[in-house]
Curated annotation (Swiss-Prot):
Classification via InterPro entries: Amidase, Amidase_CS, Amidase_dom, AS_sf, GatA
Pfam families: Amidase
Low complexity composition bias: residue spans: 119-128
Entry superkingdom: Bacteria
Role played: Allows the formation of correctly charged Gln-tRNA(Gln) through the transamidation of misacylated Glu-tRNA(Gln) in organisms which lack glutaminyl-tRNA synthetase. The reaction takes place in the presence of glutamine and ATP through an activated gamma-phospho-Glu-tRNA(Gln).
EC number(s) reported in the record: 6.3.5.7
A Gene Ontology term for the protein's cellular component: glutamyl-tRNA(Gln) amidotransferase complex
Origin species: Wolinella succinogenes (strain ATCC 29543 / DSM 1740 / CCUG 13145 / JCM 31913 / LMG 7466 / NCTC 11488 / FDC 602W)
Residue ranges that the Swiss-Prot or TrEMBL entry lists as coiled coil: none
Official protein name in the record: Glutamyl-tRNA(Gln) amidotransferase subunit A
Molecular function terms from GO: ATP binding; glutaminyl-tRNA synthase (glutamine-hydrolyzing) activity
Keyword flag Protein biosynthesis: yes
Oligomeric form and interacting partners: Heterotrimer of A, B and C subunits.
Length: 449
């Protein structure tokens, strides 16, 4: 598949031919990366695949859930309007874990998505459809959302590039909320340059999103500098949770960064067990509130019932999958009057501590290098308990808790030929430094789709 940078140079007729080619490839593919009918939001625009939790006017929006079957988006999300302004089109919807709650894209009502590198392996999640499509040659580029690693982890598992912007850098207006203080939309692309182009297209202040940062749209692509030398922190203490292939790739990446002239310094952070605990208290609490709106009354699936109480219970019981129900129950529990102080307030204090630790590291560092996941992409069905799945997020969730930007890129392959990804984490609104460092690493490795 051509890159986004190459597509920017094409005439409308050539783009139309590419869209026809994509439709054909998707119809023949077994990856299940796309869901529903492929609609084109802008004739003559560059096709960008959009995750199924972002509103595209006139297209069905399901968030991978039965409860939203048949719901058609009545408006465009801000990121879609920004794509249109840059001559890009929302072209198709990508499969995802139900309401973005998962790390494998197995919980979707549309069925699981396969990893294009090895179909017996998960593509990651929750933006697994976006990453699978980009890595599998079914999309030029895609949009995903990242609440605790949902852009970066599937990008790492499939072997493409995923950027989670700083919280507030990209408008969330039109994104179906999972955990509002953590969610962020970002690009999944074939290389770092494309990530910069798509990030520039969707970033900028939006008055319709109260958490949107009052900053001008970025111009990171024009300012990209792979020769910029930076101070990069490494966190050896956190590697004990990682498998051998990840540890080996991490230290090999450190050597490459040093050889490129970057300064490496060792730092330490709070034990990742606290990251996990705080994250799953906060995100489930927010989810239980956000998902209360899906009641069978206003939109989506409506069960047959004799009274209002029965309607609520039956619609939500039939419409939500097991993982979503689990997280709603957990969230309702931690917000209950007897446990609010013990769990929710304590988790907020840990979140503040994590942010302070990153602030301390960034006093004398430009970037932090970290694994994206403790293992390469696992096989389908290899995770036997929800806790095992949650522990797969140990390296990504702290970045969301602190609201920082981070980019995942492939740095090599395991002995089994599976992609290994690392992430560069930056200061708040420091996407330029993150992209510069990632481009330096990408060119040194020579590893891009």
């Amino acid at each position: 598949m051509i890159t986004l940078k190459q597509a920017m140079e094409l005439a409308p007729q050539a783009l139309s031919e590419i869209k026809t080619e994509i439709r054909k490839k998707v119809s023949e593919s077994s990856l299940n990366a796309y869901v529903g009918e492929i609609r084109d939001s802008l004739e003559g625009g560059i096709p960008i695949l959009v995750k199924d939790n972002i509103n595209v006017k006139g297209s069905e929006l399901t968030c991978g859930s039965k409860i939203l079957e048949g719901y058609v988006a009545p408006y465009n999300a801000t990121v879609i309007e920004k794509l249109h302004a840059q001559g890009m089109s929302a072209f198709g919807r990508s499969n995802m874990d139900e309401f973005a709650m998962g790390s494998t894209t197995e919980s979707s009502a549309h069925g699981k998505t396969l990893n294009p590198v090895d179909s017996s392996r998960v593509p990651g999640g929750s933006s697994g459809g976006s990453a699978s499509a980009v890595a599998g040659g079914l999309a030029i580029a895609a949009l995903g959302s990242d609440t605790g690693g949902s852009i970066r982890q599937p990008a790492a598992f499939c072997g493409c590039v995923g950027l989670k912007p700083t919280y507030g850098r990209v408008s969330r207006y039109g994104l179906v909320a999972y955990a509002s203080s953590l969610d962020q939309i970002g690009p999944i692309t074939q290389n770092v340059e494309d990530a910069a182009i798509l990030f520039d297209a969707i970033s900028g202040h939006d008055g319709r999103d109260s958490t949107s940062a009052s900053l001008a749209p970025t111009q990171t692509h024009k300012a990209l500098d792979a020769n910029k030398k930076q101070t990069i922190a490494i966190l050896p203490d956190l590697l004990k949770e990682a498998s051998k292939p990840i540890q080996e790739a991490y230290f090999e990446t450190v050597k490459i960064l040093e050889s490129e002239g970057h300064k490496i310094v060792e730092k330490s952070m709070l034990n990742t067990a606290y990251h996990i605990s705080a994250y799953y208290v906060l995100c489930t609490a927010e989810a239980s509130s956000n998902l209360a709106r899906f009641d069978g009354v206003r939109y989506g699936r409506r069960a047959e019932a004799q009274n209002l109480k029965e309607l609520y219970i039956k619609s939500r019981t039939e419409g939500f999958g097991e993982e979503v129900k689990r997280r709603i129950l957990l969230g309702s529990f931690v917000l209950s009057s007897g446990y609010y102080d013990a769990y929710y307030l304590k988790a907020q204090k840990v979140r503040h501590l994590i942010k302070n630790q990153y602030d301390e590291i960034f006093k004398d560092c430009d970037l932090v290098l970290s694994p994206v996941a403790p293992t390469v992409a696992p096989k389908f069905g290899s995770t036997s308990t929800p806790l095992e799945m949650y522990l797969g997020d140990i390296y990504t969730i702290s970045i969301n808790l602190a609201g920082l930007p981070a980019l995942s890129l492939p740095v090599g392959k395991s002995e089994e030929g599976l992609p290994v990804g690392m992430q560069l984490i930056g200061k708040a609104f420091g996407e330029q430094s993150v992209l510069d460092g990632a481009l330096s690493l990408e060119r040194a490795i020579g590893f891009a789709l």
